[in-house]
Design a protein with these regions (language model features):
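Periplasmic-binding protein-like
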Residues: 137-144, 225-266, 283-299
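Bacterial lipoprotein signal-peptidase II cleavage site
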Residues: 20-30
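Extracytoplasmic small-molecule ligand-binding "clamshell" domains
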Residues: 30-118, 271
């Protein structure tokens, strides 16, 4: 399994990258322009994206999806996926770092970003404002310090505990279901501590401001692999109301990207790039058979 070399305590480097941007498309050489126009799906892109020469995509730190390395490079599943999609679309992606799910969603609505790849689940409410291409699934996991394993490595231990999670994320809604299970068992509900990003949730665990950090299963696997002697995690079960959530790349409705983006995903499913990326990052269990557009609202 491929893992990130960064650990939770290094994620604060995000702030210094907020102003980074890619080189303008106007500086591309004629050869590069010709290559872009020859990409299979370039003609399907909206004129605004062709003119910009780039797809601006919001992103926060959420290993293994996105990790800010010491030299400033952003690595992870998301950049690898973007590289494969760019081969089909003919334009690169530019990750613009931000914090907070609400800020990234509203940023798309105000045209600061063309897209956002979460990880964030699609819902009927979100599909009212955004087009969503589902490309993977997740189960919620709860990370704890391994030194507290005797105390916390038990599903019932989470009941009544302090759980840090990103405000508005899948973790928040999944914890509500977990709390229903806790109460059915005669146990106290967990307390949700809403924070801006994944980095903040892990730091809360490290500093004993929270007992657990709620996150995606792939992020929990990556964090434990990066520091196996420091972290453990629980996985929310079906009995505890987990189910499986569909994670999607979001685009504002009306920006013209939905159909070409779906076609790009279909292409990388067909040519094996999707399977390769999911396998390299050890998240085959979260793979889907095919990408879908707006599955929560399509008839």
């Amino acid at each position: 399994m491929r893992t990130s070399t960064a650990v939770a305590t290094t994620f604060l480097a995000v702030a210094v990258l907020a102003g980074c941007s890619a080189s303008p498309a106007a500086e591309s050489s004629p050869e590069e322009t010709t290559s872009a126009e020859e990409a299979p799906l370039y003609d399907q892109l909206p004129d605004a994206i062709k003119d910009a020469g780039v797809i601006k995509i919001a992103g926060d730190t959420h290993p293994p999806y996105r990790t800010i390395e010491e030299g400033g490079e952003i690595t992870g599943i998301d950049p690898d996926l973007q590289a494969a999609l760019s081969e089909q679309l003919g334009v690169p992606f530019e990750i613009i770092t931000s914090s907070g799910l609400d800020a990234m969603l509203t940023g798309m609505l105000s045209n600061r970003y063309d897209a956002f790849n979460g990880p964030v689940r699609t819902t009927p409410e979100r599909e009212a404002d955004f087009d969503a291409v589902v490309w993977m699934t997740t189960r919620t996991s709860y990370v704890f310090l391994d030194e507290r394993a005797d105390e916390l490595d038990d599903p019932e231990a989470l009941c009544g505990a302090r759980v840090a999670g990103v405000t508005g994320s899948v973790t928040e809604s999944q914890l509500e279901r977990y709390n229903e299970w806790c109460q059915s068992e005669g146990l106290d509900p967990a307390e949700f501590i809403g924070l801006e990003d994944s980095n903040s949730t892990f730091l809360a665990v490290n500093s004993d401001r929270a007992d657990y950090a709620g996150t995606t299963q792939s992020a929990a696997i990556d964090l434990q692999a990066s520091d196996p002697d420091r972290y453990g995690y629980l996985i929310q079960s079906d009995e505890q109301g987990a189910g499986i959530d569909q994670l999607a790349l979001f685009m504002p409705k009306g920006n013209g990207l939905a159909e070409p983006m779906l076609a790009a995903f279909e292409a990388i499913f067909a040519n094996g790039e999707y399977e390769r990326i999911m396998s390299e990052w050890g998240i085959e269990d979260a793979a889907v058979d095919a990408p879908t557009l707006n599955p929560m609202t399509s008839e």
